[in-house]
């Protein structure tokens, strides 16, 4: 499941650039089998920001933990080392 966490955070960080107040809909990440569990665990350690909008739930990465998040992604996905700035 750590690999899935890294993949979700990589998608938010690299592809969508969802850091801080830039949110993406939770429903856009349905392909992750353990999505609810992953989101709950990442939110518990404050790496993920969850906001309830009127029509959807938005998620974003916490900029306060950018260094730790990038290190985690590179640990479980070494092929993307250096891609996230």
Where are these regions (language model features)?
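Intrinsic-disorder-associated interaction segments
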Residues: 28-31, 62, 66
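Minor-groove-contacting beta-hairpin "wing" of winged helix-turn-helix DNA-binding domains
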Residues: 55-62
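A short, conserved structural fragment
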Residues: 43-53
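Short amphipathic alpha-helical interface segments
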Residues: 1-29
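Short, amphipathic alpha-helical interaction segments positioned at domain boundaries
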Residues: 64-85
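Short amphipathic alpha-helical interaction segments
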Residues: 29-45
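Short, well-structured alpha-helical interface segments that form or flank functional binding sites
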Residues: 3-7, 34-37, 59
């Amino acid at each position: 499941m750590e690999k899935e966490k890294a993949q979700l955070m990589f998608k938010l960080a690299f592809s969508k650039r969802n850091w801080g107040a830039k949110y993406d809909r939770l429903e856009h990440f349905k392909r992750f089998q353990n999505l609810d569990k992953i989101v709950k665990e990442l939110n518990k350690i404050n790496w993920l920001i969850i906001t309830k909008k009127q029509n959807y739930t938005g998620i974003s990465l916490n900029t306060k933990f950018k260094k730790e998040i990038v290190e985690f992604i590179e640990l479980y996905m070494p092929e993307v080392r250096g891609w996230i700035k």
